[in-house]
Amino acid sequence: MGSTALPYMATQPKLIFFTDFDGTITVDDSNDFMIDNLGFGRERRQQLNEKVLNETLGFRDAFREMLSSIKTPYDECIATLLKNMKLDPYFEKFYYWARDNNVPIVILSSGMKPIISALLEKFLGHKPGNHLHIVCNEVVPRDGKDINSEGGWQIQYHDESHFGHDKSIEIKPYAALPDSERPVLLYAGDGVSDLSAAAETNLLFAKAGKDLVTFCERRGMPYTTFQDWSTILSTTQDILAGKVSPADVATKSA
């Protein structure tokens, strides 16, 4: 098996943990914070979110409209987020447990890489180790401007899907492995863009009270809820130790 084609299999893990970033690893969503405080505001954002939930507007188009309302230079956006964003209080413990137990963490985000990298480095106090991978959207200049100038940046989507980043694409090659080779695949998320990814994994951790729970209920998709990463850590430890199966966890939550 080539580790180049399947990089998260390089260390032959028994479990791979895929996760959203904003509102999942962070307490609040950094994109929502920027839109509400630096862009057109909470009310308009919620109107567009409702259209996405009702499937009358694609996430890709809605998110681009939201971010386009932010004219603040990109470096100032990052500085603002570094002052205001908080890490889930238990994620750091999960991060080090995963490192010590050969569990790759793969962040699949609809956010932008410079923001995610800056926040992780601040939260952890160092650049993330090799067991943590980030797959997300990028930021590019707008109309030939510098991204650190007024109105100078825009999002560059990871792919052409209506999500802008179809997170399932990253997981499918691992889900397709033969039973004898395939590790347990887990996913944690909170929003609409996590739905495609969740369908490819053995167990979905959906953040309590968020849009992803609503979508799972509507579509009859099995999941278990979490309030913070302490639940995720204890459940993942039990799954890796063979004390419970992902199906058992989802069934108990039903």
Give residue ranges: language-model regions.
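C-terminal cap/substrate-recognition subdomain and adjoining C-terminal extension
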Residues: 2, 90-96, 100-104, 111-254
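Alpha-helical substrate-recognition element adjacent to the catalytic core
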Residues: 2-138
